[in-house]
Amino acid sequence: MADLEKIRAAENDPARHEHAVRVTQEINRRLDLASMNALANQARAAKSPKAKVILLQKAADKFGEAAKGLVPCRKGCSHCCHMATMIHLDEAKAIAAATGAKMVTPKAFNVDLQYVDKIRARYDGVACRFLVNGACSIYAQRPLACRIHVVVDVDNTLCEIVPGQKIRLPMIDTREFDWAISMAWGGPLEMKYADIREFFPPKPDKTK
């Protein structure tokens, strides 16, 4: 059970805030923007969805490379695997092709804020279908959202999901890259996004 009092104290800890600023500055200093932007532009020009996904994955990985050794994210911490995670239709197809997992195509796609809020309410706290024994079973094919999920905190205290509670989690700012991803897919009108659990529903619990 999450210790909400401890979490709220951590949210307001000045030392944590200062740490987040320092780490963010160092990640931005390390970030290979030229390479990342070149890959994003190649993805935008790519003709096949598969090629777009591969190029965007390589671009997104630049965040993880820049953050190496600076952040609490590591194998065994699966808090973010219990968060709502929006992925593009082409990412879902790539995951299905690489893993053999059966994919369900949502009846409709939507990215407005009300939809995203509903998705968060529905899936925050629900384990990703591909979380196995506390680790991602499709790590090489994990979504872009997972690749750019970089927590700039001292530890993972603020990563814990608390139902009904909004927790301020210090993250690297990826808005510029998010826009590059949007344009690679064809712009806002082609944003065929849904939560990963919409494409790959969690397996039923046979113990119930």
Question: What is the meaning of each model-derived region?
Answer:
Residues 1-79, 83-135, 139-208:
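Short loop/turn segments that flank or connect secondary-structure elements
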